[in-house]
Amino acid sequence: MNRKKIIVAVVIVALLAAIGYGWSYYRQQQDATLTLYGNVDIRTVNLGFRVSGRLASLAVDEGDKIQPGEVLGKLDDGPYVNALKQAQANVQSAQAQLALLKAGYREEEIAQVRSEVSQREAAFSYADSFLKRQQGLWANKATSANELENARTARNQAQANLQASKDKLAQYLSGNRPQEIAQAEANLAQSEAELAQAQLNLQDTTLLSPSGGTVLTRAVEPGTILSASNTVFTLSLTDPVWVRAYVSERHLGQAIPGTEVEVFTDGRPDKPYHGKIGFVSPTAEFTPKSVETPDLRTDLVYRLRIIITDADESLRQGMPVTVRFVQP
């Protein structure tokens, strides 16, 4: 009987020990914090003018901190001011031409054409009468063939002149053709587009910062003749500051976008930065050599982009960091 009790007690103790060990192991697994390794990734942008010209001035130097919209440099705007004035004059000319066509002809011009028609009617009447007299004389053999032909030519020319004047009067009375007005409207639209481009070109002689950041490089100096898109400054953006890290396939399930993490640097081992996972690459790759990690280099990993929410000036491009996932 005592032996059975001892066996039962031993079994119970063994079960309790197994349960305790399992619970301890489970807690250790739950409490284990996933640690990743990566580098600070601060985006840079090359800044330049959209138009060409002579560089007149630069307002900042390497290391300067700049704000969005701050003036960084200017080109000599003389040629662009002249181009703008020419474009404005072209628009005014096109507007005047269109207004003239839409207004039609003045009463004075119409009266002048009416008078011209009357004069040419009289000229035609005289030429026609003269031809008829010459034809009568020719029938009586009282004039030469040359005189008759000259009279006929004069009558035909007078008739053509009269018809031209009548056509001109009809045009003046009906106004300009719709096709002419449409062409004038198209010319005005083209002139206005050229004016808008001239205004934009003049505006682009001033280089503005697109965002806040720090000037990394100043590539040229005043007096340089620049082509459009030549780099003038390289700017390190203040925001966003990212960390590029890598996670193995085994831990990929823990790397969910929006997951909060702590980011440690060698200079602040006890004061982490905070961030969230913003992107997980859908494709695997071999661990880059630039990443300090205890994992095997041959392991396939997935790239993460971690957005630092409380970044400061201590974070520099390429700085190695340690990323630890925050336990809920």
From Swiss-Prot:
Subcellular location: Periplasm
Signal peptide boundaries: 1-22
Main location group: periplasm
InterPro entries: CusB_D23, UPF0194_membrane_YbhG, UPF0194_transport
Keywords per UniProt: Coiled coil, Periplasm, Signal
GO cellular component: periplasmic space
Protein name as it appears in the record: UPF0194 membrane protein YE2891
